[in-house]
C-alpha cells in the first residue's frame, strides 16, 4: 500500500505560500487566483463536513488489481471500455480503488460524501467546493467523448453521487 496524509499536502501549500509572500512582499490582497499542479489518480475520501476519512491512496498504489479485473469483465472487457474511456482499468486506477474501499473499508466508503484527488482536495481546502478536473478524471471513469461520468460505472456498484462535479482546469472555483 502506498498512502500519504492529505494534511501534509495542505501544510506544504500553506508554508510555501507564506514563504513566497514573505520573500516577494506580495500582499494577500494582491492575489487574484491560485492554481494547483499535483499528482493524479489518488483518492481522498471526505465526509459531508469536509473532514478527511482516510489517507490519500496514491497513484502508485496497485492494491485493487482484483477489483480492476472484475470491473473490466462486468463492463464488457478491455476493448469496449477502452473505446469509451480511452484506457483499460488497472489496479492503480481510481475506479478500482473505489471498489476496493467499498469492499475492504465499507465504513470509509459509506461515510464519504466525495472522493477527491490531490488537486480537488487542495481546491476544496481553499474554497469549500468539491470538484474534479476533466484532465484527472479518466482514471475515475470519465467518458472522454461526452465529458461526463460513464453511465456504465453504475454497473460497478459505485455511488455516482460520491464523484464530484467535473470542471475544466481553467474554470474558476470559489471566489
Language-model segment annotations:
Residues 1-54, 66, 111, 164:
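N-terminal glycine/serine-rich phosphate-binding loop of ATP-dependent small-molecule kinases
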Residues 7, 11-18, 22, 69, ...:
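A broad, structural surface signal
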Residues 48-52, 70, 74-75, 80:
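Hydrophobic or amphipathic alpha-helical targeting/insertion segments
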Residues 55, 67, 71, 125:
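Residues that scaffold the ATP/ADP-binding catalytic core of kinase and kinase-like folds
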Residues 57-58, 136:
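Residue-level structural signal for beta-strand termini and adjacent loop
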Residues 61:
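Carbohydrate-associated surface elements
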Residues 64, 74, 87-91:
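Gly/Ser-rich phosphate-binding catalytic loop and adjacent alpha/beta segment
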Residues 81-175:
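Gly/Ser/Thr-rich active-site cleft segment
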